[in-house]
From Swiss-Prot:
Keywords: Ribonucleoprotein, Ribosomal protein, RNA-binding, rRNA-binding
Gene transcribed to yield this protein: rpsE
Annotated family: Belongs to the universal ribosomal protein uS5 family.
PANTHER family: MITOCHONDRIAL RIBOSOMAL PROTEIN S5 (PTHR48277:SF1)
S5 DRBM domain span: 13-76
Any one of the GO CC terms: small ribosomal subunit
Identification of the protein by name: Small ribosomal subunit protein uS5
InterPro entries, A to Z: Ribosomal_Su5_D2-typ_SF, Ribosomal_uS5, Ribosomal_uS5_bac-type, Ribosomal_uS5_C, Ribosomal_uS5_N, Ribosomal_uS5_N_CS, Ribsml_uS5_D2-typ_fold_subgr
GO biological process: translation
Subunit structure: Part of the 30S ribosomal subunit. Contacts proteins S4 and S8.
Residue intervals passing through the bilayer: none
Length: 170
Protein backbone atom coordinates (compact mmCIF):
# COMPACT_ATOMS: atom_id res chain seq x y z
CA UNK A 1 0.00 0.00 0.00
CA UNK A 2 1.20 3.52 -0.73
CA UNK A 3 2.62 5.47 2.13
CA UNK A 4 1.01 8.79 2.93
CA UNK A 5 4.16 10.69 2.02
CA UNK A 6 2.49 13.41 -0.03
CA UNK A 7 5.05 16.15 -0.31
CA UNK A 8 4.80 19.23 -2.46
CA UNK A 9 8.21 20.06 -3.86
CA UNK A 10 9.58 23.43 -4.89
CA UNK A 11 8.54 22.84 -8.51
CA UNK A 12 4.89 22.30 -7.56
CA UNK A 13 4.89 18.52 -8.02
CA UNK A 14 3.32 16.07 -5.60
CA UNK A 15 5.46 13.06 -4.74
CA UNK A 16 4.14 9.80 -3.39
CA UNK A 17 6.14 6.78 -2.30
CA UNK A 18 4.30 3.61 -3.35
CA UNK A 19 6.68 1.10 -1.83
CA UNK A 20 10.20 0.11 -0.83
CA UNK A 21 11.44 -3.47 -1.04
CA UNK A 22 14.61 -5.09 0.22
CA UNK A 23 16.30 -7.16 -2.47
CA UNK A 24 19.26 -9.52 -2.21
CA UNK A 25 22.02 -10.47 -4.61
CA UNK A 26 23.68 -13.77 -3.79
CA UNK A 27 27.45 -13.76 -4.33
CA UNK A 28 30.24 -16.14 -3.37
CA UNK A 29 30.74 -14.50 0.02
CA UNK A 30 27.04 -14.41 0.96
CA UNK A 31 24.17 -12.05 0.23
CA UNK A 32 24.45 -8.38 -0.71
CA UNK A 33 21.34 -6.43 0.27
CA UNK A 34 19.93 -3.46 -1.56
CA UNK A 35 16.66 -1.57 -1.81
CA UNK A 36 14.18 -0.97 -4.62
CA UNK A 37 11.73 1.96 -4.49
CA UNK A 38 8.63 2.76 -6.55
CA UNK A 39 7.31 6.34 -6.61
CA UNK A 40 4.72 8.39 -8.47
CA UNK A 41 4.94 12.12 -9.16
CA UNK A 42 2.23 14.45 -10.46
CA UNK A 43 1.14 18.07 -10.55
CA UNK A 44 -2.48 17.46 -9.49
CA UNK A 45 -3.69 18.90 -12.81
CA UNK A 46 -3.39 15.99 -15.21
CA UNK A 47 0.33 15.20 -15.37
CA UNK A 48 1.74 12.02 -13.84
CA UNK A 49 4.88 9.91 -13.94
CA UNK A 50 6.21 6.87 -12.14
CA UNK A 51 9.75 5.78 -11.48
CA UNK A 52 11.79 3.00 -9.97
CA UNK A 53 15.11 3.33 -8.23
CA UNK A 54 17.57 0.80 -6.84
CA UNK A 55 20.44 1.44 -4.43
CA UNK A 56 22.19 0.07 -1.35
CA UNK A 57 20.47 2.63 0.91
CA UNK A 58 16.75 3.48 1.13
CA UNK A 59 17.02 7.30 0.75
CA UNK A 60 19.21 6.98 -2.34
CA UNK A 61 16.79 4.48 -3.92
CA UNK A 62 13.85 6.83 -3.24
CA UNK A 63 15.74 9.80 -4.70
CA UNK A 64 16.58 7.84 -7.87
CA UNK A 65 12.95 6.74 -8.20
CA UNK A 66 11.72 10.35 -7.86
CA UNK A 67 14.16 11.52 -10.55
CA UNK A 68 13.01 8.75 -12.91
CA UNK A 69 9.36 9.64 -12.24
CA UNK A 70 10.02 13.31 -13.12
CA UNK A 71 11.70 12.28 -16.39
CA UNK A 72 8.80 10.04 -17.44
CA UNK A 73 5.84 12.37 -16.93
CA UNK A 74 2.85 12.24 -19.28
CA UNK A 75 -0.30 14.33 -19.66
CA UNK A 76 -3.77 12.90 -19.03
CA UNK A 77 -7.00 14.50 -20.32
CA UNK A 78 -9.29 14.73 -17.27
CA UNK A 79 -12.99 15.65 -17.11
CA UNK A 80 -12.92 18.07 -14.19
CA UNK A 81 -11.75 15.94 -11.29
CA UNK A 82 -12.69 12.53 -12.73
CA UNK A 83 -12.01 10.40 -15.82
CA UNK A 84 -13.41 10.95 -19.33
CA UNK A 85 -14.91 7.46 -19.68
CA UNK A 86 -14.55 3.92 -18.25
CA UNK A 87 -11.35 2.20 -19.29
CA UNK A 88 -9.60 -1.12 -18.72
CA UNK A 89 -5.87 -1.66 -19.10
CA UNK A 90 -3.42 -4.37 -18.28
CA UNK A 91 0.29 -4.79 -17.74
CA UNK A 92 1.57 -8.30 -17.21
CA UNK A 93 -0.93 -10.16 -15.04
CA UNK A 94 -2.26 -6.94 -13.48
CA UNK A 95 -5.55 -5.77 -14.97
CA UNK A 96 -7.14 -2.52 -13.81
CA UNK A 97 -10.64 -1.23 -14.46
CA UNK A 98 -11.33 2.48 -13.89
CA UNK A 99 -14.55 4.41 -14.32
CA UNK A 100 -15.59 8.00 -13.67
CA UNK A 101 -17.63 8.77 -10.57
CA UNK A 102 -19.96 11.58 -9.54
CA UNK A 103 -18.94 14.49 -7.33
CA UNK A 104 -18.40 13.49 -3.70
CA UNK A 105 -17.61 9.83 -4.38
CA UNK A 106 -13.90 10.11 -3.61
CA UNK A 107 -11.12 7.82 -4.72
CA UNK A 108 -12.34 4.25 -4.38
CA UNK A 109 -9.21 2.34 -5.34
CA UNK A 110 -6.60 0.19 -3.68
CA UNK A 111 -3.02 0.96 -2.68
CA UNK A 112 -0.88 1.60 -5.71
CA UNK A 113 -3.77 2.84 -7.88
CA UNK A 114 -4.82 5.33 -5.20
CA UNK A 115 -1.35 6.90 -5.21
CA UNK A 116 -1.51 7.48 -8.98
CA UNK A 117 -4.98 9.06 -8.78
CA UNK A 118 -3.99 11.36 -5.90
CA UNK A 119 -0.98 12.84 -7.68
CA UNK A 120 -2.64 13.13 -11.13
CA UNK A 121 -5.53 15.18 -9.71
CA UNK A 122 -8.42 12.71 -9.92
CA UNK A 123 -10.72 13.13 -6.89
CA UNK A 124 -13.74 11.00 -7.90
CA UNK A 125 -13.14 7.57 -9.40
CA UNK A 126 -14.15 3.94 -8.99
CA UNK A 127 -11.31 1.53 -9.68
CA UNK A 128 -10.63 -2.17 -9.28
CA UNK A 129 -7.46 -4.19 -9.65
CA UNK A 130 -8.05 -7.67 -11.06
CA UNK A 131 -5.37 -10.36 -11.15
CA UNK A 132 -1.91 -9.56 -9.88
CA UNK A 133 -1.64 -6.96 -7.12
CA UNK A 134 2.08 -6.40 -7.73
CA UNK A 135 2.46 -2.62 -7.15
CA UNK A 136 4.87 -2.14 -10.06
CA UNK A 137 2.52 -3.77 -12.57
CA UNK A 138 -0.57 -2.09 -11.09
CA UNK A 139 1.02 1.38 -11.39
CA UNK A 140 2.13 0.68 -14.96
CA UNK A 141 -1.32 -0.62 -15.93
CA UNK A 142 -3.00 2.41 -14.33
CA UNK A 143 -0.76 4.88 -16.16
CA UNK A 144 -1.24 2.93 -19.41
CA UNK A 145 -5.02 3.20 -18.99
CA UNK A 146 -4.82 6.93 -18.30
CA UNK A 147 -2.71 7.42 -21.44
CA UNK A 148 -5.24 5.49 -23.58
CA UNK A 149 -8.09 7.69 -22.35
CA UNK A 150 -9.06 10.50 -24.72
CA UNK A 151 -11.60 13.29 -24.64
CA UNK A 152 -14.65 13.32 -26.96
CA UNK A 153 -13.20 16.42 -28.65
CA UNK A 154 -9.97 14.55 -29.46
CA UNK A 155 -11.89 11.57 -30.86
CA UNK A 156 -14.04 13.88 -33.01
CA UNK A 157 -10.95 15.65 -34.36
CA UNK A 158 -9.25 12.33 -35.09
CA UNK A 159 -12.26 11.04 -37.05
CA UNK A 160 -12.87 14.34 -38.84
CA UNK A 161 -16.38 14.75 -37.42
CA UNK A 162 -18.00 17.28 -35.16
CA UNK A 163 -18.65 16.66 -31.47
CA UNK A 164 -22.42 16.10 -31.83
CA UNK A 165 -21.84 13.18 -34.22
CA UNK A 166 -19.56 11.50 -31.68
CA UNK A 167 -21.55 11.94 -28.46
CA UNK A 168 -24.98 11.75 -30.09
CA UNK A 169 -26.28 15.28 -29.61
CA UNK A 170 -29.58 14.03 -28.49
Amino acid sequence: MAQTDRRATGDGLLEKLVGVRRVAKVVKGGRQFGFSALTVVGDGKGRVGFGRGKAREVPVAIQKAMENARKNMISVPLEGDTLQHPITARHGAAKVHMQPASEGTGIIAGGAMRAVFEVVGVHNVLAKCIGSANPVNVVQATVKGLVQMSSPEAIAAKRGKNLEEIVGGG
